[in-house]
Amino acid sequence: MAPVTLSTVDTDLKDVIQHLFEIQSAVHGYLGPETQQELVRKIKNLTLALSTLSSHTQSHAPDADTAQANPSDPPISTIELPPEIIDYVDAARNPDIYTREFVELVQRGNQDLKGKKEAFAGFRDVLAREMRSAMPECRGEVDRVVRATGGGEES
């Protein structure tokens, strides 16, 4: 069986939503027995659409020989979502908010690491300068260590 792609599941979900909307409209305009058959037909269509969606989203073992032909429409079995995003959606929150908060958190972490890196580089340079002045016989070794750790040579 060929793997089910993301676009197939997307189409199935759109069909389910469309059937729900049609049922909502039919219930809102319900006139009694004369519209009952139409409502029953719409409910049967919804049931069929849900069955199709369910069969398409059953967990299948991915085939070893199915190469990902279209990266913009991957097989549904290859898509993995972080549990945090699923929790956001379950809590009726926008997953874009999670993404924004995650990016901001990573940026703050990067700024912290950059500050630490700059502080250690400054400490390295001060230590090297002090060691050169206190122990001139170690000047070559100090210069080698400074170069190896990303610093420039100081004279």
From Swiss-Prot:
Component of the Mediator complex, a coactivator involved in the regulated transcription of nearly all RNA polymerase II-dependent genes. Mediator functions as a bridge to convey information from gene-specific regulatory proteins to the basal RNA polymerase II transcription machinery. Mediator is recruited to promoters by direct interactions with regulatory proteins and serves as a scaffold for the assembly of a functional preinitiation complex with RNA polymerase II and the general transcription factors. The keyword Hydrolase does not apply. Component of the Mediator complex. GO terms for molecular function: transcription coregulator activity. This is Mediator of RNA polymerase II transcription subunit 10. It holds the Pfam family Med10. Keywords: Activator, Nucleus, Transcription, Transcription regulation. Coiled coil: none annotated. Belongs to the Mediator complex subunit 10 family. GO terms for cellular component: mediator complex. It comes from Aspergillus terreus (strain NIH 2624 / FGSC A1156). GO terms for biological process: regulation of transcription by RNA polymerase II.
